């Protein structure tokens, strides 16, 4: 069996969740301490949410004032390599997380937008010294997740699938393999599988609620309330849950490969153990599980050390429990 990926998601830029920032939320000293912790807990990959956090030559207008230079990125890639860690860039082309694009966010699905996407994908591959993967994000693109924004935009149906197809093609042309969250796939299984083959993408499923009735836990309160406002009060009736649990394992029968991604962000500490167990036992072949990634969903700053360290320890514990030391 090939060596599993044991990854952690971290942030360089924070402009993917809120209106575009003017600086990084990133502490250099804490980052170095974090890398040592990763090495100590067996992490062999960091997926770094880059966004506008590097200096783009093709689109300098989107880069933050303290964005990393090419030289800085190269030094960090080499630093990680010495610790046995791959540093993988992540962008996010979901309209719910595209503030980092600046004005291009408002040009979604137009020629200037496609040109921009192609440019930054090619450049991020070069900046990160030819990484094995490029993560494209693509989570939480819907009315529900967009409606709190001042400028609401989201794609659906065939347009969404066509844009995903374009992004994957542009990524794989670089030599990297495209990665993405599961969200638009489990909502559009037939259209997605017709458009994108199992060898063209790695899927990162995330799920912070109950996988089975045998191991239930409470739905996250704000999401529960959001659906209650629409007249849906039973967890089993939540559409995103129904579609996820209905489709996520059967997709593997078609040959798609996964890196499932648990989190401790909502205080559900057993999500990591449950996620590793669910996919290890439920996949048709363990070879299709390339590994697992923990996502603390926190800025790379020292006030989040306790929760970030916990996420790493939880992944280590699950790895040792289900895959051995």
Regions found by a protein language model. Name each.
Residues 9-202, 207:
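Aromatic-lined carbohydrate-binding surfaces of glycoside hydrolases
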Residues 1-3, 127-128, 194-198, 251-253, ...:
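Extracellular/periplasmic catalytic domains that process cell-envelope and extracellular macromolecules
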Residues 1-32, 41, 105-110, 172, ...:
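N-terminal hydrophobic targeting/anchoring segments and the immediately downstream early-domain regions
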Residues 105, 178-227, 267-284:
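Substrate-binding cleft/loops of secretory-pathway carbohydrate-active enzymes
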Residues 247, 254-325:
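Substrate-binding cleft of secreted/luminal carbohydrate-active enzymes
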Residues 4-8, 44-46, 134, 200-202, ...:
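Hydrophobic beta-strand segments of well-ordered beta-sheets in folded domains
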């Amino acid at each position: 069996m090939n060596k599993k990926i044991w990854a952690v998601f971290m942030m360089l830029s924070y402009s993917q969740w809120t209106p575009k920032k003017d600086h990084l939320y990133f502490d250099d000293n804490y980052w170095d301490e974090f890398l040592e912790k990763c090495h100590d807990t067996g992490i062999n990959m960091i997926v770094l949410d880059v966004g506008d956090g590097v200096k783009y030559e093709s689109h300098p207008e989107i880069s933050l004032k303290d964005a990393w230079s090419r030289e800085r990125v190269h030094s960090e890639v080499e630093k990680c390599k010495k610790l046995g860690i791959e540093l993988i860039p992540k962008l996010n082309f979901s309209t719910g997380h595209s503030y980092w694009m600046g004005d291009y966010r408002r040009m979604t699905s137009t020629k200037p937008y496609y040109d921009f996407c192609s440019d930054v994908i090619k450049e991020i591959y070069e900046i990160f010294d030819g990484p094995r993967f490029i993560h494209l994000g693509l989570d939480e693109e819907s009315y529900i997740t967009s409606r709190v924004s001042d400028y609401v935009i989201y794609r659906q149906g065939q347009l969404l699938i066509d844009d995903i197809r374009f992004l994957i093609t542009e990524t794989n042309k670089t030599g990297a393999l495209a990665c993405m969250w599961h969200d638009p796939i489990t909502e559009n299984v037939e259209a997605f599988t017709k458009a994108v083959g199992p060898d063209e993408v790695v899927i990162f499923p995330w799920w912070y609620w109950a996988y089975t009735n045998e191991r239930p836990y409470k739905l996250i309160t704000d999401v529960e309330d959001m659906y209650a406002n629409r007249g849906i009060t039973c967890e089993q009736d939540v559409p995103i849950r129904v579609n996820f649990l209905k489709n996520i394992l059967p997709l593997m029968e078609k040959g798609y490969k996964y890196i499932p991604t648990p989190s401790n962000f909502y205080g559900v500490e057993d999500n990591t153990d449950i996620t590793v167990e669910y996919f290890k036992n439920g996949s048709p072949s363990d070879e299709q599980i390339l590994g697992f990634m923990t996502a603390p969903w926190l800025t790379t700053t020292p006030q989040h050390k306790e929760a970030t360290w916990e996420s790493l320890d939880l992944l280590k514990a699950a790895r040792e429990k289900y895959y051995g030391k």
